[in-house]
Amino acid sequence: LICQDLCFALNQLKPSDEKRNEVIKNILGYFPDDLVLLSPFTADYGKNIKLGKNVFVNINNYFMDGATIKIGDNVFIGPSCGFYTANHPLDYTNRNQGLEKALPIKVGDNCWFGANVSVMPGVTIGAGCVIAAGAVVTKDMPANSLIAGAPAKVIKTIEQ
């Protein structure tokens, strides 16, 4: 509940309030270089979120960080995206017992996420990807790819 309370406190502050950076530091355990994180923002633990340099997190993002969520340098995350590490059993008997596991998410450098993207447990997204609005990324994606759809697939390779 500590992280949830800190996220609530962050989300009550004005964008211009100098206390924001201190609250973000308390959520993550550090303050990344050149981070822009807009409210509202929600995380489960905070300590499992590893953000690179020059990361932009737009409004209304959720980081379900039961496992590590590692975001590379120069990553731009559009509004209302979710990074979900928790995975529940298909078998209802196990699910009803509260069993779940968390799988890490990794995002390479120089990626751009459109609005309302969902990244599911255990996914790795290579560097230089553009993920279209509304995509649901359920499997690993290669670097320099335009990714779209639900479930998401590679639309084309981005020539750099």
Write out the residue ranges for each language-model feature.
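Short hydrophobic beta-strand element within catalytic cores of glycosyltransferases
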Residues: 137-138
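Conserved G/P- and acidic residue-centered "switch" motifs that form tight phosphate/ATP-binding loops
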Residues: 131, 149
